[in-house]
């Protein structure tokens, strides 16, 4: 093990198998916090390869608590975080729009690592229980079409790195591979990433992990979401191939806004923003969700273009269907908890 760690310290790439070996040591609690921190920072400085990302993602999935759901029907739209944008919870809001379109959404997420409010924080503020049993998550996916999968709950072995990640206060490979490790077997996925240089590589990794279709995007301002502030870069994985594209908000009939227009706050403030969007309140928050939900619908294959996705997302919010998904999730969750 020391030899493998030294390879990373010496800026040498690891094979997929070597990374799996180190990850297994971490997830079984056999590496000290000091060594984990040194490893993560050395890997960050060196730069993570597709082989390394796939290796650690597979190791995480092997020790995850599995959530049963028909293979190939659910999707996720969580991002890596770590973009330092301090935006509101865009992907969490968009998830209710995707669910309203009839797409089962297994929303994988965590508490805040490098922002004021993570998806788990805002979900709790909305009244969503983030510690449901796996069978309850399955029930909600079947009955409502959306369930929140709290990362530390479904990945209990991540307890060995949580304190280290929080103390480092900077994105690591775990930000990159977190969205790759959903315990539900996904067929499609939208994944935002804070590093534009890893778009193609990450799309390839999603293919290696069994996705049939996926979009990996990096927004203007290097956000891990699609942004109204300028040009968005994204990679589309389909049929074993990756193609790179760009898209500006004007391309799909949306107005440009500066990044400051979508600044969020703490969990309470972000929950209020989420509700305002689902209520259809016009402005930068709504348009940002329309763009991101549009990308999600496109990634799923529900629509043929992002433009069609934006139009459908607008209809789903105007009709009240997206807002109803939030209400249904809370209602059926109470039913589960009452058993």
UniProtKB/Swiss-Prot annotation:
Anthranilate 2 binds at residue 165. Binds 2 magnesium ions per monomer. Its EC number is 2.4.2.18. Mg(2+) 1 binds at residues 91, 225. GO terms for cellular component: cytosol. SUPFAM superfamilies: Nucleoside phosphorylase/phosphoribosyltransferase catalytic domain (SSF52418), Nucleoside phosphorylase/phosphoribosyltransferase N-terminal domain (SSF47648). 5-phospho-alpha-D-ribose 1-diphosphate binds at residues 79, 82-83, 87, 89-92, 107-115, 119. HAMAP family: TrpD (MF_00211). NCBIfam families: trpD (TIGR01245). This is Anthranilate phosphoribosyltransferase. It comes from Listeria monocytogenes serotype 4a (strain HCC23). The gene is trpD.
